[in-house]
From Swiss-Prot:
GO terms under biological process: chromosome segregation
Lineage start: Eukaryota, Fungi, Dikarya, Ascomycota, Saccharomycotina
Miscellaneous note of the record: Present with 227 molecules/cell in log phase SD medium.
Positions with biased composition (Low complexity): 454-474, 494-506, 561-573, 594-626
Keywords for the protein's UniProt record, in alphabetical order: Cytoplasm, Phosphoprotein
Gene: GIP4
GO molecular function: protein phosphatase 1 binding; protein phosphatase regulator activity
Biased composition (Polar residues): 534-554
PTM sites of type Phosphoserine: S497, S501, S609
Source domain of life: Eukaryota
Coarse class of the protein's main subcellular location: cytoplasm
Entry similarity comment: Belongs to the GIP4 family.
Subunit structure: Interacts with GLC7.
Protein name according to UniProt: GLC7-interacting protein 4
Compositional bias (Basic and acidic residues): 512-525
Amino acid sequence: MVDVQKRKKLLAKAAASASIPAIKGSVPLDSYDIKIIQYKNALYKLNELNRLLNVLVPHLKKKRDNDESYKIIPLVNFILSLCEGPIFNVSPVLAKRYHLLCRFQLIKLSEVQQRLSTNFIDVEGWMFPEEVPLDHYKSCIYNNSLQWKILNSLSCIAQNAIKIYNAKLRQILLERDAYKARSLPFDTSIIEDLLNPVEMTLILDLAVLINDPVRDKSTHSFYKLQWQVMEKLNSCVHSKIFPILRTYYNQLQKFSETRPTSLSNLQKDLPHWEWTLHRIYTFHLRVFSVLCVIISFSRQIFLPNKQHFLDIKTRLSSENVYHYDLIICELMALLSPECDDVTALFELQENLKFWTQTARTDNNSSRTPIFHLQPGLVVELFNNHICKIIPKLRSIMGLLSNWMDCWKYIEKNYKTFDETNDLRENLKEKLERDKALYLEVKNAKSKLKKKPSITKLPASSSPSPSPTSSASPSRQASLESIRTRARAHLASNSSRSPSVSPVRTTFNNKNAETKKSVVSPEKRKLINGRRPRSSSLQSYTNKQQTSYLNSTRHPSIAPPSKLNNQRSNSLQSSTMTLNQKIVQDTVRHLMNKSASTPNPSASSSLAPSPKVSSINNTSSGKSSSTLIANSSDTLAIETLTLDPESNSSELSIKRVRFAGVPPMTEAENPKPTKVGWYKKPAVLHYPPIPASAMIKPLQHKSKYNTLRQEEGFTFRKSLRDGLEWENGESGSETTMMPFGIEIKESTGHRIASKIRSKLR
């Protein structure tokens, strides 16, 4: 039952909203507009019925006159179901005549004179209540003369109802104009898309051709005919009716879920926003009419054939007895006449009465409430009324579709059982087997629904969002960004040693999330949009901090071959530029020399392999990935072992500047602060040359020559240390001076050099 207290509460809110000033440009919904919508709804359907009957009747008569053996019987009983609803309630006499036609009874064809009044149309409907015997129902359907008489009677009462509705519509428009002198005229074209009775086009298909009376009127053919009628209705609802209703339902849903509920959102999300309340009531009335047609068709087919669907032989011929019994029980609860008070149809009737419910005023006169357009009222009407309508309609159509599928399977696989067979025992055994199978499949489907559809990917910055939150979807990290972060993480870990030996790395999502949550003050400044000071105005300490923050965001290093192509800084002196070019040329010469004579220990252990990347998942839960890349200078192989929590599909190679030289530190690789700027090379502060290395001919007074001498000494020393480490030589006391001069280095100098290297 519908909650009466909730309806009264909504009615009180609607009455209270009458004192609220209306939104400028909106049109309130009152009793006059509700009556106009009711009259137009009936006129749309009756005019379409009259038009299609004028097309169908001459066509059938022409076929019958040309060929007497060509016998087509119109299925008027199903055409009457298309007219189900409150459209004939405009007159009690017409409503009674319509009910008699649905019982295959003839009526008087005299015109009904209705007293002119502008009352609300009663939404109470009538739905084929009796369970007529199957033989009587079948004989009436195949009775050609009876069907033609009922068809003519239906055309007469439809024309009579059209006259009454037109008179009522003219009168209510006059009353509305007199009551609302300056109000906008009610343009019914704004609700025409919702009121268009597209289901009436089924009238042209509701006829049966009889060639062989014995075969075409058999029980099997009769069941097939009814199944085809339901199939046409089901197809019409899904292809023509649902798209129109779904479009406006989605628009209302989008507006009701948008926060805040403002007038701008109302104007943006809803078509004809000034008439939103009129369209909501029209939508409600349209869904009620469609549901009346669906239930009337279903009752007219299910109730006469009820014993056939409950028969033991029919149940044994079904694919799954347990599933079939569940569907039949739900159909009986929905379509049985004694269950009218609990059906969705009754709830819709009560909800429609809410709009026309009258209230008593202070002077003891009755009036209907006036609904002023407010965003909050639209949201409340959607949440309390409309959001419950469409799910019920979908569930009913889903139930009917399942019933039709079972019925089709039964008719194709109907079995003939001997009388000697124990049908009840067979049914009991089949029911137990099918129940176990049905529950097993249902549990499997429920597990699949609960299983997340998105696998958890390892990300060094943020965990993957939950796939089950569809109401408020979060921004998910793309696969390319995850791979890029994984490459940066691997490159930073593997670049700590210049060796070519395999590197074993383990991803840890928790550590990555912890690191992400820590934001440095400098980075917070960058986030807030404040530009750091110019590099020429910063001290050495500030430059180191800024370059460290920038290098952590962009750890990629340009290859040596591209260093010469970079544009120099305009603030850098020409001597420093020349110094850099000399160092780069020397390094390139050494790299070519080392590439021509590769290390035998490394080359012997490496087999030629194509440039591929693969991931092998082992049974222990760990995945090993080997990536091989062949560059112009070196060949590097990295074998990575991932823990079970990580799933990485692409790894990266360690990148270094050249052989024997460790990668740039964070302070050496600053990132430009603006898009399009190139990176200014950091000023290198080399350790002073030891006193024992200061040879008199190489001492220069120029500042830049001294800096070049320190730089050359440092690079020569690092190259020598790298070569000694690769060849396994240690403890050598000779030191390589710039330009190939060998000197002896004391123990104190070696200790000081180690301390300085650690402090760096």
